[in-house]
Each structure stands twice: as structure tokens, then as C-alpha cells.
Amino acid sequence: MKKLMVIGCLITGLLAVGLVKEAPAKPTRNILIAGGRTTSPWYPLSQGLARFINQKSDWLRAEVVSTAGITGNLDIAKEKPKDYIGVDSFAHIHYRPGHPWGEKRGTYTGMRFIANVSSETQCLITYDSGIKKVQDLAGKTVDVGRKGAANTVDHMAVLEKYGVLDKVKLVYTGYGGGADKLKDGLVDATMMMFDHIYPDKFTKGGFIENLETKGPIYYIGFDRDTLLQLRDSEYATVPVWVPARAMDPNTQPQALWAYDIPTFYIADERMDEDTVYEITRIIWETPADEWAKWHPIGAHMNETFKPAMPSLKLYKAHPGAKKFYDEHGIELKDLADLLH
């Protein structure tokens, strides 16, 4: 009887061992990250993301691909939705139906939020200390973005909202061209980006520092309600509070409202949930100081700002990202609520 019991136990043990074999390893999955131009801040941050994925995932592998620009990022994610994620811009809200910019290119609504990346905070600047508000630009020459660029739509919408679009002469060159034309005296004011690490670390950046070799630069701000109204109407204008003297102790004595066209990681809605969950996990678990090694602006890739969306009303999170955030009790936030 004892022998039978021993044999029975051995058989049961062997069967149990067979039943608790390790689950087969998840097949390796390769993705590409559309990183834009190599000179853009989101390109090195995307290189960082690829490195983090390759180091921290047991089954996911990533490689960064340069594109013609941030619009190229979205285009390739749209064309190859199961292979690419990318860095998107809030300005691509104009891809939506009903927007002339998107209608010309072919509308697209499949992008889904994963995590916040970087700022593109801006206001109007001038050498003319007499121009103190947007309405003072009437009769002046103003540089906005390049013709055909998505952010130009937002620049013109701001001028229209303040009632001066039909009262100014427009020049279309973008930020670098606008800086050159302002310095050469060919325009009176230009839209200009400056460096911004969330929530409130501001520096002038190279364009403004170069302009100051000619003379002091003055800053023309907006107001929060107007920017929020524009955002609700599907323009890329996230309000940003710039405290007094944050840009310059002499030429910016008063606080002002600028606006941000944030960038963020996206995947097409057709990208599988498991892959995006894993990407989101790695983004979340990688601390800000690791991101900042790839670009200084990565310093705001922290738990406050990673889940901050350009608009909770206008965007959806990818199901894989939302699953990760929900499982870990992480609330998706409106970026505008964090920048005032």
C-alpha cells in the first residue's frame, strides 16, 4: 500500500511539473519610431525612447527613422499603422474633416495619444516698444509660418480672432525666416518660439538671442479665454502663463499669456493594444532625468506631464495606453490646466 501511495505521489508530482511549465516567450515584435528631422528636439528624445524600449522590454524592439519633418511622422504612421509610432504635433488637428488644410492633404482622424513629449511655446515679438497688444499690429507687416504649414493656420486664426488679420500685411516664412526678416527690418513683428520646460522654466532660445544683438526684443501676449476659445474651435493654442520678467527683466515687465503647440507620441488606432501598452509602460517607468540626457526638454517627462494631453475634448488615448494608465490609477490630464 505504501509503495502504491509513493508511486501515486510521484505520478501526481510529475503531472504537476508538466502543468506548470513556463509560458512560451512572447514573440519578438519590431516597431519603428518616426522621429522627424534630426535637428528637432523630438528626434533625440525618440532615440532615447528606442534605447529604453530595447533595454527594458523582453519582447519589443524599436528603431528611430528620420522623416521630412513632424508632418512626415504622422503621414508614415497613417500609411503604415501597424509598423510605426511617431511624434505628432497639436497643429495636426487640422488633418480633421472640415479643415481646408486637411482636405487638401487627405483627412485623417486615426491618431491616438500615448504620452506628452515637448513644447512649442510662442508669442509675437517685435523691436517696437510701442506695440503692446495684438490690436496694435493694425497697419503693420507680420511674419507667420510657411505657406502650407499646419501651424500657419493657427497663427492666422489668432490674428483673425483679435480682429487684425485683414489689417496687416502677411509674410510667410516660419520662425527662422521671421527672425531674419525682423532683424533686417522687413517686418514689424513675427510669431516666435522660445524654449519652455514645463511648467514654467522659460529661456529665450537661439533666435531671440540672435535678434538681441541688434536691439531689445519686446513680447506681445494674448489672453487665456481667447486661446481656449480657439482651441475649442480646433486650433492648436494651449494657453501658457509666462510670469513677469520670465523672458527679460526689462522688456517683459508684465506677465503674459503665450500659447503652446505641444508634441506627443501617437500610434494609429490600428496599432495593436499590447505593443502600445508596453511602450506606455516604458515611457512611464523611465524617469525624467533619463529623458533629459537625450535633450534638455526631456526634464519635463515626469509623472505630471507624461499623461497631459493637448485637449481631453479633442483627443483620445490609444486603447493600449489607456489600459496602462487605468490599471495604474493614472489620470489623463488637460495640459492647459497645468500651465497657468
Where are these regions (language model features)?
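Short Pro/Gly-enriched coil loops immediately N-terminal to beta-strands
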Residues: 107-121, 211-215, 257-260
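An extracytoplasmic/periplasmic, membrane-proximal ligand-sensing/linker region
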Residues: 194-214, 219, 231, 274-340
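N-terminal (or domain-start) structured segment
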Residues: 26-95
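Sec-exported extracytoplasmic/periplasmic mature domains
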Residues: 50-59, 78-82, 129, 160-164, ...
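Short, low-complexity disordered leader/linker segments with a strong preference
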Residues: 1-29, 340
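Bilobed "Venus flytrap"/periplasmic-binding protein-like clamshell domains
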Residues: 30-56, 60-61, 120-186, 195, ...
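Ligand-binding clefts/hinges and TM-proximal coupling segments of bilobed small-molecule sensing domains
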Residues: 144-158, 234-301
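Pocket-lining segment of extracytoplasmic ligand-binding domains
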Residues: 90-92, 98-102, 130, 166-266, ...
